[in-house]
Amino acid sequence: MTFNHKTIEELHDLLVKKEISAVELTQATLADIKEREGAVDSFITVSEEEALAKAAALDAKGIDADNLMSGIPLAVKDNISTKGILTTAASKMLYNYKPIFDATSVEKLYGKDMIIVGKTNMDEFAMGGSSENSYFKTTKNAWDGSKVPGGSSGGSATAVASGQVRLSLGSDTGGSIRQPASFNGVVGLKPTYGRVSRFGLIAFGSSLDQIGPFSQTVKENAQLLNVISGNDPKDSTSSQEAVPDFTNKIGQDIKGMKIALPKEYMGEGIDSKVKETILAAAKHLESLGAIVEEVSLPHSKYGVAVYYIIASSEASSNLQRFDGIRYGYRAEDIENLEDVYVKSRSEGFGEEVKRRIMLGTFSLSSGYYDAYFKKAGQVRTLIMQDFAKVFEKYDLILGPTAPTVAYDLGSQNQDPVAMYLADLLTIPVNLAGLPGISIPAGFADGLPVGLQLIGNHFDEATIYQAAAAFEATTDYHKQQPVIFGGEK
């Protein structure tokens, strides 16, 4: 028996009425994973024993009728710490690492009696846009196994798209939730920087990283964000901003809502079919009463260059801790301390991670700091100011999530710059610390196209309002990959 077609509210109703138990729901989810995993390779670890133990304990305690998430299974990206469960960041460096603590976001999941069924595959240390940089396996697109699933949270996206789980957590540093959500036709949100605690997230770019939810529908996405949001004294960058119920505006109409469409988001490098799909989505939002107008974000064209200086610089600092001494991989053929560092890091890190460490170390080095890192910080401020000007007049910004649909596995491995440019439309949102969502908006060449909606700081509720209005009047979110029961 499978329950992957039921919403969280429907599953909650079944659990409360005792028509199914938490153990039965968990067993059904694990069965879905066993049946579907081979086609997509979403998981690094399936935590069957731990999940069933938590479900059994919950059945003994009883499902809380007032807690929507009680007994609901989900998957978690493998750079989010889970006590006693492998947390590898998809790297040889951490191939056997079992944390002795839970990330704050995981504590919040457990606090709502949610059940983690496994840890999902990703690009190593979240560095990549295709999930091909994993030490363990290559995740495949849920719609076409010859295409990339996007990255770095490819496993979290495909686990939802393939019907293995209804919900998952990912992390987003430059588009790592939104781009794979777009490529796999699911909902993925990057919250405002500081909305969700980063404590227990294996750091990549500390001024950019955010944990966020993947889901089948907009409302379920908001329901999961409700669980993981809030201030955390263990994370000095987490915000004191009050956390609303993110479902509050879902169902409200969008008449009079002002939405900006930046001309830079529809320019050079954007696939013509993707452009057509997004313009059709904009027209649809207008038919629902929204006012869509063209604007300019003039400094967004510098986003990719700025991002790869800042993110790589932060990564080169953050990844210094992986030295073969405290924990993680240590090379065997060593004769002195220098060997420990050089050989362990050379063997433990993959090519893309080493590339970014070198890029970041160069950008921070004396003689180059002012020309690169300092200058990137100044341009980042200009990008923030561009967004601030637009949000003085507009409620939301829309555009494509990615410039293309999913591309062939292996096609960009030798051209890192081409892969970096795939984040052209998502990176500025991270640089400005803004919230952004990708929702299914149509298809091009039989592959999903994501619509990105960007909101002002801490205004995820308005994003969800518009996204839900679009979803309620279209059928794109209901379409499933043929391999997993969808229609041709």
From Swiss-Prot:
InterPro entries: Amidase, Amidase_CS, Amidase_dom, AS_sf, GatA. Gene3D superfamilies: Amidase signature (AS) domain. Its EC number is 6.3.5.7. Signal peptide: none annotated. One of its GO terms (biological process) is translation. One of its GO terms (cellular component) is glutamyl-tRNA(Gln) amidotransferase complex. It holds the Pfam family Amidase. GO terms for molecular function: ATP binding; glutaminyl-tRNA synthase (glutamine-hydrolyzing) activity. It catalyses: L-glutamyl-tRNA(Gln) + L-glutamine + ATP + H2O = L-glutaminyl-tRNA(Gln) + L-glutamate + ADP + phosphate + H(+). Keywords: ATP-binding, Ligase, Nucleotide-binding, Protein biosynthesis. The active site is at K77, S152, S176. Belongs to the amidase family. GatA subfamily. Heterotrimer of A, B and C subunits. Allows the formation of correctly charged Gln-tRNA(Gln) through the transamidation of misacylated Glu-tRNA(Gln) in organisms which lack glutaminyl-tRNA synthetase. The reaction takes place in the presence of glutamine and ATP through an activated gamma-phospho-Glu-tRNA(Gln). This is Glutamyl-tRNA(Gln) amidotransferase subunit A. It comes from Streptococcus gordonii (strain Challis / ATCC 35105 / BCRC 15272 / CH1 / DL1 / V288).
